[in-house]
Amino acid sequence: MSDQLIIFDTTLRDGEQSPGASMTRDEKLRIARQLERLKVDVIEAGFAASSNGDFEAVKAIADVIKDSTICSLARANDRDISRAAEALRGANRARIHTFIATSALHMEKKLRMSPDEVLEQARLSVRFARNLCGDIEFSPEDGYRSDPDFLCRVLEAVIDEGATTLNIPDTVGYAIPELYGNFIRNLRERVPNSDKAIWSVHCHNDLGMAVANSLAGVKIGGARQVECTINGLGERAGNCSLEEVVMAVKTRRDYFGLDLRVDTSQIVPASRMVAQTTGFVVQPNKAVVGANAFAHASGIHQDGVLKARDTYEIMRAEDVGWSANKIVLGKLSGRNAFKQRLQDLGIALESEAEVNAAFMKFKDLADRKSEIFDEDILALVSDEQSDNQAEHYRLLALSQHSEMGERPHAEVAFAAGDVEHHARSDGNGPVDASIKAIESKVGTGAELLLYSVNAITSGSTESQGEVTVRLQLGGRIVNGVGADPDIVVASAKAYLAALNKLHSKAERVAAQG
């Protein structure tokens, strides 16, 4: 059995299924480039047959990413598989991931197919896919709740037809670690040709055990691929968290005995990028990537860490991308110092023009904020990369007036395509007034589901505010994120960012979990 663990990232497919986490083509491409820097083995770029937008995103990623295998999901039918193959045509290494449900509940209630019909559909789909691509992954949806005897028949059949990876999903997060690990092991032992494929795990977090179940599937079951997402992003309670699985295997190599290709120093930049793009803020106590992951408040702990870090730290913050350099930048810092901080933070901009634009934003921020921290730099770079996407709505100017005893009002100038709009409105506060001013011109009628503010850095009233806005329109939910030292400006940016996602909406068909 191989001692190499394959990391299969599905942030751009399964992660995006989280309500409000929809991403544009350019956002997906930007995250894919970061995943390549992270050195994940496989990037599931999307579900090419679900929409024209997803097809274009998969195609764009396949055309530019060279160091990771690019994968597209496809239902077990010729149309989906052909569409996936077409989108992946430019990939250096391509994989088609096809699936069909195998649990009695799904076959009867959703598919309305008999077990024999499902078995035949699985066989034919893998055979068809193998004629188009040499790397085929098969998933029995709701595999963990499937009858083991029937599941073994399906898995044996698809291996015979050319499946190279077998992925066993715990689609609804029902599994318990020991039981799931034994389930994978029993399948491997009972399927006669199991040695001809790599076994994979895909766990959801409904009971909070996605990471534990995945690791049990590896250690007990012998799986050699883990499907996961950055920050554990995903529908309902989320997916297995990439950063947690990777650091568990790396930190406890004495137990797992497995090697990883992942460059762990790129974990925090990837986490920050996904959080900023989707609007799903990372909780402070999140393992590995949370703001408090390496913080020590207890005096006893602080004393121990100062004397010897390994008294209370089992991994180093800098190993996962938290900078060990505590130098704070300011308005006198030059371009070279700024570029060095980008390098230290693992941020790779695509061109000198992007570096120059980010540096100009840095100087503008430094004029308004005396000290610039790493978190500020990560936020402004993400903001700059979003600006480069030629978005439909762009904030041009904003002013607001608020006095005690008077109703606040705001004036907003923004562009919608090539048209410049000026709007004025009052409101219950300056944020409310600003959003009402924008809405008076765009007239979407979108429902505001969420408005939240987080301080990007702590310990100062100068901290930038990061605002997340969640809108719903016609059954579609989107998030927008904006950052600025002025909370009102950050709020307007976030609202326009959400409107941009509504403007570029694309209908998608449902995928497996």
Curated annotation (Swiss-Prot):
It holds the Pfam family HCS_D2. Pathway: Amino-acid biosynthesis; L-leucine biosynthesis; L-leucine from 3-methyl-2-oxobutanoate: step 1/4. SMART domains: LeuA_dimer. Its EC number is 2.3.3.13. Residues 5-268 form the Pyruvate carboxyltransferase domain. The keyword Amino-acid biosynthesis applies. SUPFAM superfamilies: 2-isopropylmalate synthase LeuA, allosteric (dimerisation) domain, Aldolase. One of its GO terms (biological process) is L-leucine biosynthetic process. Mn(2+) binds at D14, H202, H204, N239. Its cofactor is Mn(2+). InterPro entries: 2-IPM_HCS-like, 2-isopropylmalate_synth_dimer, AIPM/Hcit_synth_CS, Aldolase_TIM, LeuA/HCS_post-cat, LeuA_allosteric_dom_sf, LeuA_bact_synth, PYR_CT. It comes from the Bacteria. GO terms for cellular component: cytosol. Residues 394-513 are annotated as: Regulatory domain. Keywords: Amino-acid biosynthesis, Branched-chain amino acid biosynthesis, Cytoplasm, Leucine biosynthesis, Manganese, Metal-binding, Transferase. It catalyses: 3-methyl-2-oxobutanoate + acetyl-CoA + H2O = (2S)-2-isopropylmalate + CoA + H(+). It is found in: Cytoplasm. HAMAP family: LeuA_type1. Homodimer. Catalyzes the condensation of the acetyl group of acetyl-CoA with 3-methyl-2-oxobutanoate (2-ketoisovalerate) to form 3-carboxy-3-hydroxy-4-methylpentanoate (2-isopropylmalate). Belongs to the alpha-IPM synthase/homocitrate synthase family. LeuA type 1 subfamily. This is 2-isopropylmalate synthase. It comes from Leptothrix cholodnii (strain ATCC 51168 / LMG 8142 / SP-6) (Leptothrix discophora (strain SP-6)).
